[in-house]
Each structure stands twice: as structure tokens, then as C-alpha cells.
Amino acid sequence: MRSYELPKSNIYHSAGSSEGTQVKFFSDGKWFKQDLNGYEGETEYIVSCLLSCSNISDYVTYEKCMINGKAGCVSKNFLRENETFITFERLHFSYTGQHMLDAVMVYSDIKERIEYVRQFIKKNTSLDISGYLSNIFSVDALTLNYDRHFNNLGIIYDSEKNIFREAPVFDNGAGLLSNVSRFPVFRSIEENSEHIAGQPICANLDLQAYYAGITLQIDYEMFENLYIQTLKPSRALLVLKYQLQQKRKLFPDLKKN
């Protein structure tokens, strides 16, 4: 595991979430995030390992590291020259003056909430984000990532070409019960998972994924051989193994399709 010493001048300040804000640095085209509530960095790493054995190709690869003496993770910047990541919240507020969550929650039906988001992005960027939402919400359901919100869902804008493109799957660190204060280690995985309340469409992560359309497929044998048998045992890995067993019918085997 590599260790980095980064100056405070490289700290990046961004909008936080309900879980607080991880200290983030940007240096030499890479993003560095220190753990805040538990083992977010390890979760980012393990989830990206899983995605390397899936049918999702557009995702950010993370590596575990030490940052100024604290555990965390590092990833390459996914933005190209002249590109900016624009969150759904920022885009929605700039066009309507209203928070996207407030607009979405006007609808009582889960499907209608998702459709509102799709149609808003389609109208203002010409992007069909159906596949993006399917990928994101499927990964969240599998990994128990309850901290997805309209400030880490977004699209990418190229200011030179004046075009938009989908963002990759990233920011998965709140999954796998990584917040040890909220999901203490003395509770079983089953007990902790019962306390998961998802975002941003509904509290049930499985329903959120279902109504977005589940397309995630996993090469279970590849993941077993490349990672489960080789990675150091950890709570994050244990939670993922449990979830893969519980959700196997929801996320089919890539080799059998």
C-alpha cells in the first residue's frame, strides 16, 4: 500500500452529505480521500474490484493508500480536458431554483420519481441517463450504499464542444457498512442491513434499483478467483460476500447470459 504526503493547499472543498465530508486532496491528476467514518477507502477499492468482474465498463478504479498517515483511497481523475462534473442538484437548481429532492418527492410513486429525473436530464442535456441510473442504483442495492444523493449523481460537460456525457460509477465508499458508528461491528450483517435507509428516490435500495431497471450482471467465478480467494479478510469483504449470496437472483451470472 502506497503512502502519500500531501500539503493542505491541495485540499478540495466540496458539498458534503448526511455522513459528513471526507477530506479530499487533488494532486497530479489524482483524487485522494481520507477515511472519515470507518473503512470507506477499502470499500471503494473492493467495489471497483467487483465492477471489474461485471458488465459495467464505465467506473472509477480505486486503490487503497495512506494519506498523511491516515487510511484512504486514490483514483485517477476521470475528467478530460475542458470537462466539468455537474451534479444533478446543481443543474436542477440552476434551471428551476428548486432543490431536485424537493421536486422528486412531490411524486408518491417510485417510478414517477425516477422518470422525473430522467426527463429533466433529457430535456436539458439531451442525455438518456436510463443506463446510468440503472448501473448506479444496482451497485448501491448490492453494496448497501445508502448515501447516494443528487450531489454525487451527475453528468459531465465539455465546455469546448458544448456537449454532455454520462459520468462513470464512482463514490461508493458509504457501502458495505463502512460507517462503523452507524453500523457497529458488534451487530450482525443482517441486523445492520435492517437499518439501511436508501436515497435519493426511496428508502428501499432494492426497489430503487428495480424501478430504475436492473441490468447489472456479475462474473461470480472470476470475482471468486481473482479477489475473494486472494484479498485479505476484512469486514468489507465479508459484507460483500454476504450480499452476493443474498442477491444472486437479483444480479445474474454474467457467464450464463
Name each model-derived stretch.
Residues 1-135, 142-145, 150, 154-257:
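Anionic ligand-binding catalytic core segments
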